[in-house]
Amino acid sequence: VGILELTRGEKGTQGTPAERQAECVAAARLMDLSWRGQLGLPDGELADTPPFAHALAAALRTVRPRVLVVPHWHDRHPDHFGTYHLTKRAIHLAALKKADLGGDPWRVQRVLLYQGNSDISANVLVDIGSVMTEWEAAIRAHTSQFAGGYVSETVTPEIIERRQGRLTYWGTLLRVKYAEPFEAEEPLLLDPLGL
């Protein structure tokens, strides 16, 4: 499992790019990621543009992920819905044999959309009760985001409690303590014995 950050968050209200970078490194350690990358696209400007899509497609060919987890297209944050549309183009480009991106073509098998700042029509729920301590520690590693109180409608001093409440709600649907919701755009094939 790895994370590719598209920007350095340089235009964010809280924290400097250096602070945010250090926080990302700390959170990655807490999550025990196998890799972490930084694409360096401009913060506040993520959109489905050919240069951005080529950069992301080249990264997909290098990293070769089977599954991508990206922000939902309905998120209120412009960079989040921009990431969704950019990712869809990059996935297509990465698979094209004649796309001049370097490396061998790569086809991502599955895209899951995560719940950010808006509601989603979740059709995949993952029991995360066993990793909630790590989940909270990874969020708290982003200390600059919690300095100074209220930042926006969604980034408040109560963000962890609010997100835990949301995870508790989704967990009740599975009869577990916490569940992370995702939306799969395509049907998932399940083992009927696993139901």
Positions of the model-derived regions?
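Metal-dependent de-N-acetylase/amidase catalytic core
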Residues: 47-195
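Active-site rim/loop-helix segments in enzyme catalytic domains that contact anionic ligands
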Residues: 1-63, 183, 192-195
